């Protein structure tokens, strides 16, 4: 009798354990199915809703070529466009309502009133210290000046690319650049940068680390300086820290919601730092009109083609953004 009861209890316990194991197995299988389904759903959603960043098409100065549209239809209804121009333009036009007139012309191209913003800057040099590129699409007009070619090239390199930067403590540390994408960016009201390359014993190569006057000057009284030195060699750096800052930066890639339109000049400026590569002219364009009304009329005519070789981004850019990826 007791044997039967013990057997019954044992069978009952085994059944409970077996049932518990089956339930846990079913739960694990269901969890796997549910999580896998969620993962597939999220992946498909991300792919179907992903931002189209378009194509990096080279623009060699001519704006009469049709490019494949890399933006969504109706994008102008929800996008903003910023047009940056020098003070010279508004002075020459000398019309208090010229912006309203251009806004009406942009309206005929599909850009609603209020979606186009006009931003004035005093000079290329001043603009390079504090550019504020907040719109979905940003067009920067730069009047060609032979005496400012290098400033224009550096500014274009700065705003047409994204940079990830970190502060540099030049009083405590030596620094070296790791490759072509690694640069030191100096910004301020007046930047004079000197460097002293060091050998493996941390002795100066052609300079004395204790004598700043023996350092090699790579920038003098600049507001923006992108410094490139020999890769893989430590350098001691001297900088006018009271009027300037310097950051250790790595170029991450193109900032595709910015384009530069060069006004005048025989060729589009090449902003490539590497002399062995083809000129970098992505989103660099050129118009050759003498009068600013003609320049703006051309931009209105070709605005949609210009935007089609750009890509809308949600990240804004100001002077602090050169130090961080935003």
UniProtKB/Swiss-Prot annotation:
Residues 165-167 are annotated as: CNP motif. This is Outer capsid glycoprotein VP7. Residues 253-255 are annotated as: GPR motif. Calcium-binding protein that interacts with rotavirus cell receptors once the initial attachment by VP4 has been achieved. Rotavirus attachment and entry into the host cell probably involves multiple sequential contacts between the outer capsid proteins VP4 and VP7, and the cell receptors. Following entry into the host cell, low intracellular or intravesicular Ca(2+) concentration probably causes the calcium-stabilized VP7 trimers to dissociate from the virion. This step is probably necessary for the membrane-disrupting entry step and the release of VP4, which is locked onto the virion by VP7. InterPro entries: VP7, VP7_1, VP7_2. It is found in: Virion; Host endoplasmic reticulum lumen. Homotrimer; disulfide-linked. 2 Ca(2+) ions bound at each subunit interface in the trimer hold the trimer together. Interacts with the intermediate capsid protein VP6. Interacts with the outer capsid protein VP5*. Glycans are attached at residues 69, 238. Its main location: virion. It comes from the Viruses. It comes from Rotavirus A (strain RVA/Human/Venezuela/M37/1982/G1P2A[6]) (RV-A).
């Amino acid at each position: 009798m007791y044997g039967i009861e013990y057997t019954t209890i044992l069978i009952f316990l085994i059944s409970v354990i077996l049932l518990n194991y089956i339930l846990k197995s079913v739960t694990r299988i269901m969890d796997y199915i549910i999580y896998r389904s969620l993962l597939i759903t999220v992946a498909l959603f991300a792919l179907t809703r992903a931002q189209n960043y378009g194509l990096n098409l080279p623009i060699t100065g001519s704006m009469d070529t049709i490019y494949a549209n890399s933006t969504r239809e109706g994008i102008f209804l929800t996008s903003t466009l910023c047009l940056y121009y020098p003070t010279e333009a508004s002075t020459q036009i000398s019309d208090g309502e010229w912006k309203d007139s251009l806004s009406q012309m942009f309206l005929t191209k599909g850009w609603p009133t209020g979606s186009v913003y006009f931003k004035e800057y005093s000079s290329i040099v001043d603009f390079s210290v504090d550019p504020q590129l907040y719109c979905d699409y940003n067009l920067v007009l730069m009047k060609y000046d032979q005496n400012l070619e290098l400033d224009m090239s550096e500014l274009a390199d700065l705003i047409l690319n994204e940079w990830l930067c970190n502060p540099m403590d030049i009083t405590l540390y030596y620094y070296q650049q790791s490759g072509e994408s690694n640069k030191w960016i100096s910004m301020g009201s007046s930047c004079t940068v000197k460097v002293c390359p060091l050998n493996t014993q941390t002795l100066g190569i052609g300079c004395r680390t204790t004598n700043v006057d023996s350092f090699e000057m790579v920038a003098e009284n600049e507001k923006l300086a992108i410094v490139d030195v020999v890769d893989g060699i430590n350098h001691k750096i001297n900088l006018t820290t009271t009027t300037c800052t310097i950051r250790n930066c790595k170029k991450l890639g193109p900032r595709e919601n910015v384009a530069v339109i060069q006004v005048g000049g025989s060729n589009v400026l090449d902003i490539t730092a590497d002399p062995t590569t083809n000129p970098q002219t992505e989103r660099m364009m050129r118009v050759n009109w003498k009068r600013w009304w003609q320049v703006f009329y051309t931009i209105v005519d070709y605005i949609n083609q210009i935007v089609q070789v750009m890509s809308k981004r949600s990240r804004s850019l100001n002077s602090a953004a050169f130090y961080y990826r935003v």
